Amino acid sequence: MAYSGAQKALKSDKLDEAQALAKSCAGRPDFLPCDGLSICATHSHGKCFKLHWCCYLGWCHCKYVYQPMTNVAQLPSTPVPAAPSDCPDTIDLSISLTERFLRISPCFQAPPCPESPKYCNIAELFIDDYIVKRINGKMCYVQRPQAHVEPAQMNPIQKQHTEDKQIVEETVKGPKMGHCSSPSTSEDSGINALGGHFLESCEEESEEEDELSTDGHSSPGSLWDQDECTLLSPSKSMVEIIENIETTV
């Protein structure tokens, strides 16, 4: 009994609150009465923006609405011109930018031309010009011989014969090389590889000659065995022993 009485008192309090709220809402100028379930069915707070008495809920919606929506007719509008103006409705952006660029292009200046790079040969960085040669299996620094000016009118066969003859003459006339030393300790800042028989080489060379004699390319003894001749000229032995290597230092 007491519980039912309390429920009735609670309902009456809610009804009184709803009626008082409806009266306060009805006094506002934007209050609209309920026009049916079509509006009251959308009583969600996120969709129902009109201030009206909702017959579905039993009280006024103005409690849950913060601001009424402005009527579309009252919104500020831009007057539409009656006659079309000279300006087109659309514009080609690429053409417009191109025209603007052509107008202001004379203001631009070309960047300064960079200086041309200066090249130099690596050989110019060294005081002396050396090449590496293998003499009796030893790698030694040898001063590069100066290039000789050759006649322009010469057949290839005669040219090759002249070069071979010149190499043989230089090897015969050149001094004998006593040992392999560094370029800094020699008199001409390099070892003169165009020496004599080259049978007198480095002191530590005897053991290496024995090891290199097995391949038949590095030692003079192997060359003598291959040629089957009793006597070999010094110039020929020098040409066979010295091997030019393309590496430059």
UniProtKB/Swiss-Prot annotation:
<dbReference type="GO" id="GO:0007399">
    <property type="term" value="P:nervous system development"/>
</dbReference>
<feature type="compositionally biased region" description="Acidic residues">
    <location>
        <begin position="201"/>
        <end position="213"/>
    </location>
</feature>
<dbReference type="InterPro" id="IPR029670">
    <property type="entry name" value="UPF0524_fam"/>
</dbReference>
<feature type="region of interest" description="Disordered">
    <location>
        <begin position="174"/>
        <end position="230"/>
    </location>
</feature>
<comment type="function">
    <text>Plays a role in neuronal and neurobehavioral development. Required for normal expression of the postmitotic and mature neuron markers elavl3 and eno2 and neurobehaviors related to circadian rhythm and altered light-dark conditions.</text>
</comment>
<comment type="similarity">
    <text>Belongs to the UPF0524 family.</text>
</comment>
<protein>
    <recommendedName>
        <fullName>UPF0524 protein C3orf70 homolog B</fullName>
    </recommendedName>
</protein>
<keyword id="KW-0524">Neurogenesis</keyword>
<dbReference type="Pfam" id="PF15823">
    <property type="entry name" value="UPF0524"/>
</dbReference>
<dbReference type="GO" id="GO:0048512">
    <property type="term" value="P:circadian behavior"/>
</dbReference>
